[in-house]
Curated annotation (Swiss-Prot):
Core subunit of the mitochondrial membrane respiratory chain NADH dehydrogenase (Complex I) which catalyzes electron transfer from NADH through the respiratory chain, using ubiquinone as an electron acceptor. Essential for the catalytic activity and assembly of complex I. Signal peptide: none annotated. It comes from the Eukaryota. This is NADH-ubiquinone oxidoreductase chain 4. It is found in: Mitochondrion inner membrane. PANTHER family: NADH-UBIQUINONE OXIDOREDUCTASE CHAIN 4. The keyword Translocase applies. The chain crosses the membrane at residues 20-42, 60-80, 98-118, 147-167, 194-214, 224-244, 256-276, 284-303, 308-330, 351-373, 391-411. GO terms for biological process: electron transport coupled proton transport; mitochondrial electron transport, NADH to ubiquinone; mitochondrial respiratory chain complex I assembly. The lineage of its organism: Eukaryota, Metazoa, Chordata, Craniata, Vertebrata. The gene is MT-ND4. GO terms for cellular component: mitochondrial inner membrane.
Length: 459
């Protein structure tokens, strides 16, 4: 584990001691090397868990998420290069330092064995993200977005801390590996329902559950490109990861408590998909589509069947890469026409034909076109929920239809049509941007050929 954490820490001297003209090249190449070092994690052992030490471990759930986190850092650095050109050197270095802090916390969160350590790291990811949003965001509303983000996350996760201390006192240990083997039935306690709610609420806010999702569109719209990418691709997955870990431990109670949440998610996923059809702001549309996809993941996790767990893990990884790519594309539009309004970006296909190809691919992966891993994840979840109740097929089928509609709406609004006359002297698409898009697309295509490596614990 240290061979991933230590090189990540050594990125700090790379930033602060590099030659000023070489910062971007050094950072990108070094972080890409670190991401390639995580590839052996795909080769999971037979008993499904690599225990590196008493503090860190990885299994077939945490290693795909860990790889996604590490893979995203070079992509964030490549995407941020243009909008930091006018910033002073000191601020560039601070921005990159924040990204590395965030990556370090995320790596340790996904591999922590002890629940209190997991909680501390889970909360500390908030600090660099908040600084990135409130310092490098585009408009003054970023402060409001930062406040929403901070208070939703903090208030949601305070009950988790109380619940963890209570469990520590009653069981004597908060180690995942010990608690999975714990035979005592938690549902015998009078407070088991409250305990379940306290444990799960933090992750429901982070996912976010429909109704607790108001911080997400605000944070996404105001964040700079790297903030949006890491928020969509990894920070939302922290919620799913925590839920997958904790629902297994709190198991008998989950069967009773899951009903209202599953209904709310099935309803919320259709509502947020419908909101997407009415959006004019491109980043806001992608943010609401994230809420809709994550609702499907919550449904899958609460179903508690092997199939739904596999679907949830596959969907989390697929959505991480897809939404990150969509935010990059939205940012490349924003850098050229300085507006997030889709109506003003129409007709860009004539100017940037290669970008239009990336838009097409990203939209198709977002609407879960057959060969892609997105469809595999969605189908697993839909089949698991169908076996839970036949009526869910109406909701999930309707959701897939609306997802296809808003993905194609987004594509046609930004690429097709007659271009507006205020668009002039548009820069061509850079090699940097094309590389960035292909580095999002490549893992998606490769996972399509071998999806079993991201199917999680129950494969």
């Amino acid at each position: 584990m240290l061979k991933i954490i230590m090189p990540t820490i050594m990125l700090f001297p790379v930033i602060w001691y590099s030659n000023n003209t070489m910062i971007w090249i050094n950072m990108t190449s070094y972080s890409l090397m670190i991401s390639l070092m995580t590839l052996p994690l795909l080769n999971q052992t037979e008993n499904n868990s690599n225990n590196f030490s008493l503090t860190f471990f990885s299994d077939s759930l945490s290693s795909p998420l860990l790889m996604l986190t590490v893979w995203l850092l070079p992509l964030m650095i490549m995407a941020s290069q243009h909008h930091l050109t006018k910033e002073s050197l000191m601020r560039k270095k601070l921005y990159l330092s924040m990204l590395i802090f965030l990556q370090m916390f995320l790596i340790m969160t996904f591999t922590a064995t002890e629940l209190i350590l997991f909680y501390i790291l889970f909360e500390s990811t908030l600090i660099p993200t908040l600084i990135i949003i409130t310092r490098w965001g585009n408009q003054t509303e970023r402060l409001n977005a930062g406040l929403y983000f901070l208070f939703y996350t903090l208030i949601g996760s305070l009950p988790l801390l109380v619940a963890l201390i209570y469990v520590q006192n009653s069981l004597g240990s908060l180690n995942y590996l010990v608690m999975n083997m714990w035979s005592q039935d938690m549902s015998g306690l009078w407070s088991s329902n409250l305990l379940w709610l306290a444990c799960i609420m933090a992750f429901m806010v982070k996912m976010p559950l429909y109704g607790l999702h108001l911080w997400l569109p605000k944070a996404h719209v105001e964040a700079p490109i790297a903030g949006s990418m890491v928020l969509a691709a990894v920070l939302l997955k922290l919620g799913g990861y925590g839920m997958l870990r904790l629902t297994m431990i709190l198991n008998p109670t989950t069967k009773i408590m899951a009903y209202p949440f599953i209904m709310l998610c099935l309803w919320g996923m259709i509502m947020t998909s419908s909101i997407c059809l009415r959006q004019t702001d491109l980043k806001s549309l992608i943010a609401y589509s994230s809420v809709s996809h994550m609702a499907l993941v919550i449904v899958a996790i609460l179903m508690q069947t092997p199939w739904s767990f596999m679907g949830a893990t596959a969907l989390m990884i697929a959505h991480g890469l897809t939404s990150s790519m969509l935010f990059c594309l939205a940012n490349s539009n924003y850098e050229r026409i300085h507006s997030r309004t889709m109506l003003l970006a129409r007709g860009l296909q004539a100017f940037l034909p290669l970008m239009a190809t990336w838009w097409l691919l990203a939209s198709l992966t977002n609407l879960a076109l057959p060969p892609f891993i997105n469809l595999i994840g969605e189908l697993f979840v839909i089949m698991a929920s169908f076996s839970w109740s036949n009526l869910t097929i109406i909701m999930t089928g309707f959701n897939m239809l609306i997802t296809a509609l808003y993905s194609l709406y987004m594509l046609t609004m930004t690429q097709r049509g007659k271009f507006t006359y205020h668009i002039h002297n548009i820069k061509p698409s850079y090699t940097r941007e094309n590389t960035l898009m292909s580095m999002h697309m490549l893992p998606l295509i490769m996972l399509t050929f071998n999806p079993k490596i991201i199917m999680g614990l129950t494969y």
